[in-house]
Amino acid sequence: PAEVMADMQELYSIFARNPLILRINTIIIVFKIHLISTRMEEQTMEKKDLDWGNIGFSYMPTDKRYVANYKDGAWDEGGMTSDPNVVINECAGILQYCQEIFEGLKAYTTEDGSIVTFRPDLNAERMMDSARRLEMPPFPKERFLEAVDQVVKANAAWVPPFGSGATLYLRPYMFATGPVIGVKPSQEYQFRLFGTPVGPYFKGGAKPLTLCVSDFDRAAPNGTGHVKAGLNYAMSLHASVTAHAAGYDENVFLDPGTRTYIEETGGANFLFVTKDGEVVTPKSDSILPSITRRSLVYVAEHYLGLKVTQRPVKLSELDEFAECGLCGTAAVISPVGRIVDHGREICFPSGMDAMGPVTKKLYDTLTGIQMGTIEAPEGWIRKIV
């Protein structure tokens, strides 16, 4: 800053005359630098002037993002950039053969004003698994966590305040940048991570959803349904648009082998509650291993003392459940009030007005852990600021 430079010039002019004054001025300047840096840090921590309660779930560019490149068998040092644009070769593997994976996690402002992330180590591990399945070089776990920390710190002003109902959604992704004209893995890749503030994933928030059983398949048997890759989500777009046009909030995808078992929706896992209060989650090799579902299972067992069963769930048994919800990073838990199966309506006793009692307890407990109002299991919360 200019005021510090002026002090430095004055200091040098008197240095030869009085070393004691030099020491005193040095102390004063160091103190000024500390005060100025503190003020600058406070300014960067000031939240953006946004209507946090009504921002919706959409992309909003923030200040900085992280970029690292893989070439000649190794990742470079990586670093932050303010440029949101990606420039790649016209024959890049991502453009020709959809070689891409991604993750989703959130940063939260807790009750005490800290900024934290929720179980980012699991996102790093899942992304490494996805990379191996698509023949891509895994981005190291520690570097993934460092990238998350850097992006959150650089965009701290974009992390919504506590109690706003909004969060900073973080999107790590990796794609093939090297030119590939034959069907084979690329030799070059780019890892990027950006953040964007978001509100609830579903417009109605906690209002129960109406779903329809889809005629389309999300994944193939022994395919990539368990991998968080863009190609899986591209496959669901037509089904999603068709469902929305018919007035439904989401699709219910069935197992592609027999079309008799519940899998998931286009962007979330299912969670059911029996009339006896038991939590049931569908089990299938083609379902994405949701970190939110895994966390809810732990919360149900260890915080709420509920019985939890993970097993295949038949479409024909849905009317035996008392509650139904969709869970994922974006949605957390969204209640489902009704599922329509080609004219047959399955209405859950929890109704169309609010979350069922067990679903509500699960939601309140998990979000309480994320926001710092409920003590978290060891290792679940990573404090960044």
State where each predicted segment sits.
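Extended, Lys/Arg-enriched charged tracts that mediate electrostatic binding to polyanionic substrates
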Residues: 163-171, 175
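Charged, gly/pro-rich active-site loop segments
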Residues: 142, 151-165
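Helix-start/capping segments and mature chain N-termini
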Residues: 40-151, 173, 180-385
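Residue-level detector of alpha-helical hydrophobic segments embedded in or interacting with membranes
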Residues: 4, 14-15
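Short, positively charged and aromatic/hydrophobic N-terminal segments
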Residues: 12-14, 21-41
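Methionine residue identity
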Residues: 5-8, 40
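Short, low-complexity, intrinsically disordered N-terminal modules
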Residues: 4-5, 27
